Amino acid sequence: MTSSNTLQKAIDLVTKATEEDKNKNYEEALRLYEHGVEYFLHAVKYEAQGERAKESIRAKCLQYLDRAEKLKEYLKKDQKKKPVKDGESKSDDKKSDSDSDSDDPEKKKLQGKLEGAIVVEKPHVKWSDVAGLEAAKEALKEAVILPIKFPHLFTGKRIPWKGILLFGPPGTGKSYLAKAVATEANNSTFFSVSSSDLVSKWLGESEKLVKNLFDLARQHKPSIIFIDEIDSLCSSRSDNESESARRIKTEFLVQMQGVGNDMDGILVLGATNIPWVLDSAIRRRFEKRIYIALPEEHARLDMFKLHLGNTRHQLSEQDMKLLAAKSEGYSGADISIVVRDALMQPVRKVQSATHFKKISGPSPTDPNVIVNDLLTPCSPGDPGAIEMTWIDVPSDKLGEPPVTMSDMLRSLAVSKPTVNDDDMVKLRKFMEDFGQEG
């Protein structure tokens, strides 16, 4: 769409809005005014040539926004009276402001939208389920668990952390750690929000959502606000960013600073894979910045054991150690994928087998009963091999083939790590400059 087309579209929309306004179709007029302003702002940002043209469009935007706000106020008051006229005194507006905040339907609507971000059920992830990351766990216990359990410890100048940033390569357990915090902080309300929960297409609504998020957190103290991929909301300020993004960032800064509000009992927990794009003022609000690195060998060993669980396998402790050594550079998520792929290998053996043989083992229907007529895949040369496919095997007679070391090595060979060296260099540089190791 060219500049003239965008501007013309904006002019057409506000012209229609004015007509609907005159005809007292206020809801339609409000919709058209807001739509028109969006087109005007698009033209200012991307297409308007010259500062004078931009100033002219901005002045028009303010005029139409002012009228839209008055219409919104009128529609909010469910009374049969005329709307505030253009240029009329704002005394009526002041009267409406005197109404109780708790009765504000717009606030209720925004808070209702945010209620969906509250994790009502605990995720059931314990500290022991998170392999490694001891420094990160200790910092989170210090910030969340101890102040709730021993509030008398954190008085006077000794105050708990208000903001913690978890940064590191993708798949290292940042979100998983947040789930563990939600589980262990029994008395806390856990808000898990993403950028989509806070960004709205309506002008001015996004920053109201941010404000209402913190208001909700204050109402449900003690509370934890977890913002995943915080870089999508709070990247560095620049000339070419939208006005909406700038306002969201400003509201975040105001709320996290606690200007005019109390931040006691509220922890903001952020997670990002690309911390270097965060705005410096936002970075300062996160007092603790913890680097969640790729797992070390002992942590990778624990991860292989955790992901295998009680699945039938033939891996020895030595095999596990070898897998941990061979998986350097793999994140926790990468190891999870390797094990999941290896766990599918017995299923593939069943699918491709042309011969089965009888074995004894626990019954698939009752593991406490040992039966002697289970069928498991085998090679054609095995003693007792019966030529058949999985279709011929009764559902309660299949003997599950165990996961073997060769299955794990095959999966490790085909599943590559997802973290690249360039990102690791940037993350280590950020950690050296601003963070601490987790």
From Swiss-Prot:
Protein name according to UniProt: Vacuolar protein sorting-associated protein 4
InterPro entries: AAA+_ATPase, AAA_lid_3, ATPase_AAA_core, ATPase_AAA_CS, MIT_dom, MIT_dom_sf, MT-severing_AAA_ATPase, P-loop_NTPase
Tissue-specific expression: Expressed highly in head, silk gland and testis with lower levels in fat body and ganglion. Also expressed in ovary and hemolymph, and weakly in Malpighian tube and midgut.
GO molecular function, one term: ATP-dependent protein disaggregase activity
Mutagenesis / variant outcome for changing E229Q: Loss of ATPase activity
Domain comment (free text): The MIT domain serves as an adapter for ESCRT-III proteins. It forms an asymmetric three-helix bundle that binds amphipathic MIM (MIT interacting motif) helices along the groove between MIT helices 2 and 3 present in a subset of ESCRT-III proteins thus establishing the canonical MIM-MIT interaction. In an extended conformation along the groove between helices 1 and 3, also binds to a type-2 MIT interacting motif (MIM2).
Any one biological process term the GO annotation gives: endosomal transport
Compartment annotation: Prevacuolar compartment membrane; Late endosome membrane; Midbody; Cytoplasm
Modulation of this protein's activity: Activated by Mg(2+), but not by Ca(2+).
Quaternary structure note: Oligomerizes.
Membrane topology recorded in Swiss-Prot or TrEMBL: Peripheral membrane protein
Binding-site list for ATP: G168, P169, P170, G171, T172, G173, K174, S175
Assigned protein family: Belongs to the AAA ATPase family.
Keywords on record: ATP-binding, Cell cycle, Cell division, Cytoplasm, Endosome, Hydrolase, Membrane, Nucleotide-binding, Protein transport, Transport
GO CC annotations on file: cytoplasm; endosome membrane; late endosome membrane; midbody; vacuolar membrane
Composition-biased stretches (Basic and acidic residues): 84-98
Domain (MIT) ranges: 7-73
A Pfam family: AAA_lid_3
Name of the gene this protein is made from: VPS4
Catalytic reaction equation(s): ATP + H2O = ADP + phosphate + H(+)
Job description of the protein: Involved in late steps of the endosomal multivesicular bodies (MVB) pathway. Recognizes membrane-associated ESCRT-III assemblies and catalyzes their disassembly, possibly in combination with membrane.
EC number: 3.6.4.6
Region Disordered, annotated ranges: 76-113
Domain of life (superkingdom): Eukaryota
